[in-house]
Amino acid sequence: MSEQFQHVSVLLHESIDGLAIKPDGIYIDGTFGRGGHSRQILSQLGENGRLYSIDRDPQAIAEAKTITDPKFTIIHGPFSGLKQYVEELDLVGKIDGVLLDLGVSSPQLDDAERGFSFMKDGPLDMRMDPTSGIPVSQWLQEADVEDITWVIREFGEDKHAWRIAKGIVAYLENEENEPLTRTSQLAKLISEVAPKSFKEKKHPATRAFQAFRIYINSELDEIDTALKGALDVLAPEGRLSVISFHSLEDRMVKHFIRKESKGPQVPHGLPLTEEQIKALGSAKMKPVGKAIKPTKNEVNENVRSRSSVLRIAERL
């Protein structure tokens, strides 16, 4: 890995411990990133164990190809395709554990050319896979104020969404302005139009940048599909270990595990026979322990871990 863009895996040991690795098990790392979790899983596998890792970032794929362990296979694609990949491998119901480390990796944030960070000047892109989809700069050119407001409010949970969206559209409609193509331009613009608040510790552009990244990569849809796919491919007693980095992600994971742990909810008094109730199915998984957050030591060593949450569940 390039020394310039190092990545420290968050909740590394806790998430791997949550998988309860079997030496001869079959595992999926849905988010290879720079391989921290994958390498840890591989170190615990015996000769007959297998690890299939997934990533849609070409730089992550290049890093994965440096691993020569015959137990390891890298798959280039979004983790929402997890179920499809496992079906093609004819391993549905045979997977002993699935790990999902959500969010943006440190090398992606640190590489200005990827356009994820308002702290660094770079192209206003934000695509996880630069070979598909459109960059944020193009989307902003084509979107109206209502669309931009909705994205910032829905995915950034920013109460100033309307004001920020109006400022962006006003800038773009002024022909005297330079094209909005750089992260530094957008960060400066948001800082100028967002109301000044002494209570807000974060940079004014934090939530909007998060919102645009989530939207342009369809991240929440990807997570929803991946969670459902993981449930479908896991073997009985197989583990699901998910690390999230903001409240939108964590709520999705929490609600998914809760829903699948309860099974179908039958309204009280509904006239169903015992056979009909059984036909509705039962709980498909159970939570393992409580949500885990990083220790103070980990946060001190890696400040980006401070918002992370790990949730673990087991297939029934």
Curated annotation (Swiss-Prot):
**Which organism is this entry from?**
Aliivibrio fischeri (strain ATCC 700601 / ES114)
Q: Which compartment or compartments is the protein found in?
A: Cytoplasm
EC class? transferase
Can you name one GO molecular function term for this protein?
Answer: rRNA (cytosine-N4-)-methyltransferase activity
Catalyzed reaction equations:
cytidine(1402) in 16S rRNA + S-adenosyl-L-methionine = N(4)-methylcytidine(1402) in 16S rRNA + S-adenosyl-L-homocysteine + H(+)
Q: What disulfide bonds does the UniProt entry report for this chain?
A: none
The gene behind this protein is rsmH
User: Gene3D superfamilies under this entry?
Assistant: Putative methyltransferase TM0872, insert domain, Vaccinia Virus protein VP39
**SUPFAM superfamilies the record matches:** Putative methyltransferase TM0872, insert domain, S-adenosyl-L-methionine-dependent methyltransferases
The UniProt entry's sequence similarity note says: Belongs to the methyltransferase superfamily. RsmH family.
Pfam families on file: Methyltransf_5 (PF01795)
GO CC terms for this protein? cytoplasm
| Biological process according to GO | rRNA base methylation
Which NCBIfam families does its entry note? 16S rRNA (cytosine(1402)-N(4))-methyltransferase RsmH (TIGR00006)
UniProt keyword terms in alphabetical order: Cytoplasm, Methyltransferase, rRNA processing, S-adenosyl-L-methionine, Transferase
This molecule's function is given as:
Specifically methylates the N4 position of cytidine in position 1402 (C1402) of 16S rRNA.
Q: What is its main location?
A: cytoplasm
Question: What EC number(s) is this enzyme filed under?
Answer: 2.1.1.199
What is the protein name stated in its UniProt record? Ribosomal RNA small subunit methyltransferase H
